[in-house]
Amino acid sequence: GDLFDGGQTIAADAPISRCPLYVKEGSILTLGPDVQYANENKYDNIDIVVYPGKDASFLLYEDEGDNYNYEKGKYSTIPLKWNNKAKRLTIGKRSGSFDGMPLSRKFNVKIVGDDKVREIRYKGNQISVK
């Protein structure tokens, strides 16, 4: 939870059980479930972690994960935008589709510095989270 100015070298304790993570303010990180191989799990439950401090955007790209159908346009994207002043994350309308794409999914939205995790049921249309 410490804040550091950029452009410096930091010596940090990093035992094998704890790896330090440094993330630029105004970043959006998406995390899927732990899997052993790409198509083991349908990624219908995704964590979205917002590191506030500046406005941010991220394009969540998804495809079947096990073939080249993305070259034929079989993929989807979901835009994510963080408005730092309003403290609002907008999960935009999904574009595109692919075989086996989950039509509904759960996003667990965590804004760093706020202990609350917001569970959002997303069905492809724009939704805002504060």
Regions from the PLM with identified roles:
Residues 1-115, 124:
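Catalytic core of carbohydrate-active enzymes
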